[in-house]
Amino acid sequence: MPRRAARAALPLPDLVVLVLQGGGALGAFQAGVYEALIDLGIELDWVAGISIGAVNAAIIAGNERDQAVGKMREFWEGVSSALPSLPVVDNDWAREWTHMAAAGQVAAFGVPGFFIPRFPPPAFAERQTPEAVSFYDTAPLVATLDRLVNWDRVNNGKVRLSVGAVAVETGNFRYFDTQCDTIDARHILASGALPPGLPPVEIDGNWYWDGGLVSNTPLEHVVETANKDMLVFQVDLFPARGDRPHDMEEAWSREKDIRYSSRTRRISDGLMRRRKEHRLIDRMLEKLPAEYADLPEVKAVRKMVDCKALNLVQLIHQPPAWQTGARDFEFSRSTMEVNWALGRDAVEAAMKDGHLLADSIAEGRSDSFAVQSNALRPKAEPDVS
């Protein structure tokens, strides 16, 4: 049952979570989503991220609620400062050309406050060192995070933070979580250390790479470790649906969308299906004769069943026609502003039909929603037959 209400007349359950996936420069979309949620009076209890999502999550958890948007704006204006806004031409071909040129500049010169090209290059570095296995140095991001994030607040504040990374030597996925770990800039860098561009990060004697190599969304960690009714806003940076590509640029873009969104969709659909299956099992257990209630097998099944309500809202970045497969490493100011505005628009579109979500929360149901055709719609029911 809801425990509080946002200014958007949305009842909020025990746990409100923002889930942020990886996607480089597309993280500005996440910032727009967060700003819109704050404007609606929606308070977060937990933020979980991978890669650029971990960066945004750390800024959220590491600042007062009324300061976090400003700090996020400072971060995104900083990383886009080398490529200021150019005159916007109302022509997709011209915008695509400037978009690709901006991405090329990032590849050649790096991103201010984020990463710079390594010199000397990795071929001249000592073998089996971070310098030998990456083209860029992320030391600037450490300084940026230490300036924008209050780590004491991250580890002792009200908003729980979780970030995901993968161990290089074992391939095992790991979440660093303020509920059991002390998090600092190293953990954020580890979550976004995408090889071979960015270097692995050593934590407790182990090297870690970008968590997106295994899973680009921390939704599974959130759902499986929580034991409360929850509302989850999942920000997806790569759409599952798209048009048939016309050329190589569009093929590159579509391939990237499918590669990342398919794993995210499989996880989210699987979790919702499991939650609905648990509801059915719980109803079946209630119908068992009383003499079976104390059987070890029945107790074990009852313990496994999770019937807490889960409402999932997927806010999906829908790229303009001129954004190509380079959009996750195109950090120009004009594109950053476009992505930020798209994030705000996604939340506003969802709240136009907020009564659908409000009804589901108030009734204690588990449902999944997504913004489609500029409106919030329930996703198709997972088949539990």
Language model feature labels by segment:
Residues 11, 155-157, 305-308:
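Extracellular/periplasmic catalytic domains that process cell-envelope and extracellular macromolecules
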Residues 122-228, 234, 241-254, 328:
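Active-site gating loop/helix substructures
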Residues 1-16, 159, 166-169:
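Small-residue-rich anion-binding loops in enzyme active sites
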Residues 246-288:
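Acidic, Ser/Thr-rich peripheral helices and adjacent loops at domain boundaries
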Residues 125, 132, 140, 145, ...:
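C-terminal helical/tail subdomains of lipid-metabolizing enzymes
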Residues 48, 164, 231-235, 311-315:
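Hydrophobic/aromatic beta-strand patches that form the interior of the parallel beta-sheet core
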